[in-house]
Amino acid sequence: MGPAIVQSLGGMKYILVVVNDFTRYTWVVILKDNSEVVDKMIHLCKKLQVEKNILIARIKSDHGREFENSKLISFCNDQGTKQEFFAPKTPQQNGVVERKNKVIQKMARVMLNNKSMPKSFWGEAINTACHTLNKVYFHLATKKTQYELWRGKKSVVKYFRVFCSDCYTLRDQENLENFDAKSDKGFVLG
């Protein structure tokens, strides 16, 4: 998804959304440039293969240049991963990822607008939206969360806080006088 009209913190403009086909567990990677997609995709694939001790059978994507290049094709061939492309100009064939994009984007928009946050925080809102979806959204067929299907354990959400809610950081290493504030006010981003 991208490029974003407003850059996020760190100059980020693009979003790579990766969805596991069975569990619908989702990963988002915020990118500065579209040219980073291949390296980030390869890194994520290697990480997931080590984490789950599996080989990725298939990568499905559109015909974007970032997916249809020699580096990713070579990686897929080396790993024994089949690379499949959807027909050009048919986003409905990639419905799962397209729908995730929309849902994550809408959630992020609500989070930012609810607290009147600057649009430059969209990257943090996107990450929070994805994390929240993975932890609370139920897979219809199994009645389990995406997190539970992917990780094999129940998701814990008691640590969740409202996006941009007030928080306080302790100033314990500073030389404070008797009546100085012992904390600084901030807000939670995720």
Question: Can you say where each PLM-predicted feature lies in the sequence?
Answer:
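Anionic group-binding determinants
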Residues: 1-190
